Every structure is written in structure tokens, then in C-alpha cells.
């Protein structure tokens, strides 16, 4: 039962945080586009801005979700922690990609983001496990 709670809690945390960050990003993007209409050189870096800000914030959120999952599950082996964090990563990526890929195909950038997200959620769990083993 604790495993299920850990997976649900980690997934809900990631979904809620990314939803709120998405809203914040939309407000920033509207302001940026308004500013870019006056300064033409800003239009050229719009796509770069999305990747430079979005991917690191996404990875930090996935890391925190993996950390929360591992702390709630309270497992003491790397394999069990990795399984829980990987499950959270797959659930959240599946939920986000299902709506995004309804009428399109997966790109190389999407594959890289999926790999980074799974790595970040697993790293969050391993970070918790490392800190937990040191404190014992």
C-alpha cells in the first residue's frame, strides 16, 4: 500500500507543479511576445528560450518527484527505489505525452526529454536513498 501511495504522491506532485509552471510560462510567453513585437532580434531566440528554461525546470521537478516517491516508499535497495521512481516517471510522461501526441509523432527532442525525465526521477530517488543510508 505504501508503494502505491508513493507512486501516486510523486505523480500528483509532478503533475501539479508542472501545471502551475506551465501557467506561469504562458504568462511570461505572452509578455515576451509583446516585447518581441517591438524588438525583432527577440523573435529569433524564442524557441531557444523555451528549451533553456523549460527543460532544466522540468528536470528539477522530475528530480523532486522522484525524491518524494522514494521518501514515501521508504525502500532500502537501489532496485526497489529505481522501480518506484521509474514508474512515477513513466506515469507522468505518459500522461503528458498522451495529450501532446494525439495527432503528431514523437520527435528526437521528445525522446531526449523522455530519457532526461526518467533519469531525473531516478536520480531523485537515488539521492534520497544515499542520504537515508548515510543517516542510518
Residue ranges and their predicted role:
Residues 1-136:
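Juxtamembrane/disordered regions of integral membrane proteins
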